């Protein structure tokens, strides 16, 4: 398969690896970007955290509520300047009202919804003309809780990051603290037992190849033990329950929750552009 300059550019943006390394990775994986990323990680050229990449656009994430339902949505613009514009802010408000009133739970339904004799998609095109930048709706998500459960939220930088937490009971101060922690610490999973087995197996495979390369003179049993230790540390960093609480690094999140007689049922962390 021919490796094009565009393919190399795409892989470099995702991994920050060098041009030669990206070209080789693409050759080895027959042009498959995702497999090329894994190839680079196995070679130790990039770190796991870089796989997710960075935000590439501006805009706002927001959360609106209706009883036991919460709706998250993200609207994008090309620049931060426009996202702070009065017209853009009003658009965010209007879309939130439409979502709530009509209980719209995905972007497709919202874009097709008829509002004041035009679809929301047409409304976005109008705003694009007014603001001089491409304005898009990226995503919508509905989260429903049980009556005895409670919502907690935290917004950072006016909506660059929005976090929604569901606690098993009503603990306003705790839910706000946990939401703030999630915004700062970026957990990928709730608890170790909630980690996707496929993800775990892939991570272990990559760690094993990296470790075997670093310690090629060590016996297989020792390498396996080191891999298990590294995997355990990685899970502690990724799982909300195991992370050091942002307000008290000597206390794990799960211990903070236990001390307050509550627990996290679920959470959503959205970062604008990701």
UniProtKB/Swiss-Prot annotation:
Gene Ontology, cellular component aspect: cytoplasm
Similarity remark: Belongs to the EF-Ts family.
Ranges where the record places region Involved in Mg(2+) ion dislocation from EF-Tu: 79-82
NCBIfam families associated with the record: tsf
Native source organism of the sequence: Onion yellows phytoplasma (strain OY-M)
Pfam families referenced in this protein's UniProt entry, alphabetically: EF_TS (PF00889)
Keywords: Cytoplasm, Elongation factor, Protein biosynthesis
An annotated Gene Ontology molecular function: translation elongation factor activity
Keyword Membrane: no
InterPro entries referenced in this protein's UniProt entry, alphabetically: EF-Ts_dimer_sf, Transl_elong_EFTs/EF1B, Transl_elong_EFTs/EF1B_dimer, Transl_elong_Ts_CS, UBA-like_sf
Major site of localization recorded for this protein: cytoplasm
Name of this chain's protein: Elongation factor Ts
Record function comment: Associates with the EF-Tu.GDP complex and induces the exchange of GDP to GTP. It remains bound to the aminoacyl-tRNA.EF-Tu.GTP complex up to the GTP hydrolysis stage on the ribosome.
Subcellular locations according to the entry: Cytoplasm
